[in-house]
């Protein structure tokens, strides 16, 4: 396998927005080069998780090695490295771009350039990749290739005179793409003599062999008898096997600079082989790791609780297993008086959170309650100390803190300009600060806002899509913390604080949200034998209150007629019982009530 010269290797990836046909195009390339036999072919071949196929998104990276005989009758090795297109996974994208020399920029010929595509194109340009524009879905009746070419030139500044028109569905233009990959993407640098360095661009957990690491050799070579060192985690391993993905794993003896492959070395967890880490040889280690490694930090937090308390050990076990294959997931145990035992989990973003939740429910058969998502707040205490908190119910009381700062993001929204008004309205409702508005083409516009992350993580994305009939797309990145007039809003049920419903809100919005919460709870909590007050409070001040009236048992039903003093005695006894009940009684809030309130539009 390794007698191929570096000049015959091409490493490339596909950059595309969700739904622009990236996975279908990858299927066609695998099929046309004969990498996957016709009978084994299934749609979205590289998307190995059911969830990926269903949602039509790529979550975990995959890689495939194809052999292609070009028109110059030379045989080339093409390594396709698949990338996720969603904003939550931008770090994963940046690393897979580092493993390539070129990229196919796939744009739907009926829809045009979208926000996440743009973000990834800029990442590719930063990594000096050769970009080949490809217009997909040209067979659709609504496709207008020339208009989209012009848009790519105006928005990204790429020359589209030699852009390729293709339809991954019908197979038109696939040959042209393969030829372009060979002729336009540069071959890897020939650094076989330098010290060995390889970049990890993906890893997954295999229950039998431990972590399988996908890597690209940047310089030097790796032999299956070598002992390797991972430079960021400082751990060393004996190799069990190395090989290539074609696209099923195939063992080889050695991989040289420029090649892409996998290795297994009985690595216990994905956290030991982090994406972006550098592999080198234990005996002759490289001096410097490859640049750009950073640990992915969670931005969104929420509590996960099993609906059935007996499932707590199962939840813990399944989170441990998930973390083996998802290094960005963080979790720690948490207890709540209302929900019992559960975990506080950190995610890269909302999509990541939904996917983890869905995988827990689907792959591990758990029934979960998820508390409202929150972000990391910076609390400035009176003694000038700063603390970071991701759980609103643990924020100190107003007397002991000076101010609360919250993370802000810079957001770019791309949309047809007829939706301008409604999008600007949405951003203003979410406390966004207008920065700029640019017309990309005569009918497409970019809105740039600075907006608190907490306002984005609830349901901003859904709102944006529904207000623009699905045409708008967005991408955002953190720009730092800012002070705001924020307060902790507590919900008290029968004078006891319900932790899962605690949230941090802006002072101006506190009354509206508090009012909504208590009204919703009043509908949902069943009546008890005594009166239950439900209150929303900021500190010690109650800002909204409702009460659920008591159920009344008719204690007089058995005295027909009879003496009035007998009736008074029974009523007095009942009143006394209710008073005792109110003091002793606990209100059992059904979990449906929590669920409904958490779904209540933020």
UniProtKB/Swiss-Prot annotation:
GTP binds at residues 19-24, 136-139. Residues 7-196 form the tr-type G domain. It comes from the Bacteria. Its EC number is 3.6.5.n1. GO terms for molecular function: GTP binding; GTPase activity; ribosome binding. SMART domains: EFG_C. GO terms for biological process: positive regulation of translation; translation. It is a peripheral membrane protein. CDD domains: EF4_II, EF4_III, LepA, lepA_C. The keyword Ion transport does not apply. It catalyses: GTP + H2O = GDP + phosphate + H(+). It is found in: Cell inner membrane. Keywords: Cell inner membrane, Cell membrane, GTP-binding, Hydrolase, Membrane, Nucleotide-binding, Protein biosynthesis. It is an enzyme of class 3 (hydrolase). It holds the Pfam family EFG_C. The keyword Transcription regulation does not apply. GO terms for cellular component: plasma membrane. InterPro entries: EF-4, EFG_III/V, EFG_V-like, EFTu-like_2, G_TR_CS, GUFP, LepA_C_sf, LepA_CTD. Belongs to the TRAFAC class translation factor GTPase superfamily. Classic translation factor GTPase family. LepA subfamily. Required for accurate and efficient protein synthesis under certain stress conditions. May act as a fidelity factor of the translation reaction, by catalyzing a one-codon backward translocation of tRNAs on improperly translocated ribosomes. Back-translocation proceeds from a post-translocation (POST) complex to a pre-translocation (PRE) complex, thus giving elongation factor G a second chance to translocate the tRNAs correctly. Binds to ribosomes in a GTP-dependent manner. This is Elongation factor 4. It comes from Prochlorococcus marinus (strain MIT 9515). The lineage of its organism: Bacteria, Bacillati, Cyanobacteriota, Cyanophyceae, Synechococcales. The gene is lepA.
């Amino acid at each position: 396998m390794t007698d191929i010269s570096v000049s015959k290797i091409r490493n490339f990836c596909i950059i595309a927005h969700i739904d622009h046909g990236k996975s279908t195009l990858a299927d066609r390339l695998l099929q046309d080069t004969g990498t996957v036999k016709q009978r084994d072919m299934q749609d979205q071949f590289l998307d190995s998780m059911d969830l990926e196929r269903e949602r039509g998104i790529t979550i975990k990276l995959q890689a495939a090695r194809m052999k292609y005989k070009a028109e110059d009758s030379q045989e080339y090795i093409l390594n396709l490295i698949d990338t996720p297109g969603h904003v939550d996974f931008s770090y994963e994208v940046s690393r897979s771009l580092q493993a390539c020399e070129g990229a196919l920029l796939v744009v739907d010929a009926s829809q045009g350039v979208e926000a996440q595509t743009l973000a990834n194109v800029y990442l590719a340009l930063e990594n000096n990749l050769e970009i080949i524009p490809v217009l997909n879905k040209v067979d659709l009746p609504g496709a207008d290739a020339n208009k989209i070419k012009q848009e790519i030139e105006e928005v990204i500044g790429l020359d589209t005179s030699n852009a390729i028109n293709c339809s991954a569905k019908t197979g038109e233009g696939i040959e042209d793409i393969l030829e372009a990959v060979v002729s336009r993407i540069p071959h890897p640098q020939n650094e076989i003599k330098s010290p060995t360095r390889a970049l990890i661009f993906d890893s997954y957990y295999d229950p039998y062999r431990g972590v399988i690491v996908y890597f690209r050799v940047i310089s030097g070579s790796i032999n299956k008898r070598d002992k390797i060192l991972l430079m960021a985690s400082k751990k060393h391993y004996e190799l069990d096997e190395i090989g290539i993905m074609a696209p099923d794993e195939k063992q080889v003896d050695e991989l040289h600079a420029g090649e892409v492959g996998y290795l297994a070395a009985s690595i216990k967890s994905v956290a030991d082989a982090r994406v972006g880490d550098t592999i080198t040889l234990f005996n002759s280690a490289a001096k410097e790791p490859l640049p750009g490694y950073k640990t992915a930090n969670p931005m969104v937090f929420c509590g996960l609780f099993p609906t059935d308390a007996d499932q707590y050990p199962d939840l813990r076990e399944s989170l441990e297993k998930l973390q083996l294959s998802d290094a960005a997931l963080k979790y720690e145990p948490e207890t709540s008086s209302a929900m019992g035992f559960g975990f506080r989990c950190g995610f890269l973003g909302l999509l990541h959170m939904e996917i983890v939740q869905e995988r827990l429910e689907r792959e591990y058969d758990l029934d979960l309650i998820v508390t409202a998502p929150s972000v990391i707040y910076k609390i400035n205490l009176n003694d000038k100390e700063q603390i970071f908190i991701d759980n609103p119910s643990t924020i100190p009381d107003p007397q002991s803190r000076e101010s609360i700062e919250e993370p802000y993001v810079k957001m770019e929204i791309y949309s047809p300009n007829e939706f301008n008004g409604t999008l600007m309205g949405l951003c203003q409702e979410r406390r966004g600060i207008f920065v700029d508005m640019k017309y990309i083409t005569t009918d497409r516009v970019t809105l740039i806002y600075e907006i608190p992350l907490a306002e984005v993580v609830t349901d901003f994305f859904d709102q944006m899509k529904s207000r623009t009939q699905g045409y708008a797309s967005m991408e955002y990145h953190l720009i730092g913390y800012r002070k705001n007039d924020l307060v902790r809003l507590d919900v008290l049920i029968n004078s006891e604080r319900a932790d899962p419903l605690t949230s941090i809100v802006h002072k101006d919005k506190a009354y509206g949200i508090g009012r909504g919460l208590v009204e919703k709870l009043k509908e949902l909590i069943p009546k008890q034998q005594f009166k239950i007050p439900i209150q929303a409070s900021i500190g010690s001040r109650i800002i909204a209150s409702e009460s659920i009236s008591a159920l009344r048992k008719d204690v007089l039903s058995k005295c027909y007629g009879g003496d009035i003093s007998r009736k008074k005695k029974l009523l007095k006894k009942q009143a006394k019982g209710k008073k005792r009940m109110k003091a002793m009684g606990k209100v059992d809030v059904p979990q449906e009530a929590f669920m409904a309130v958490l779904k209540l539009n933020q």
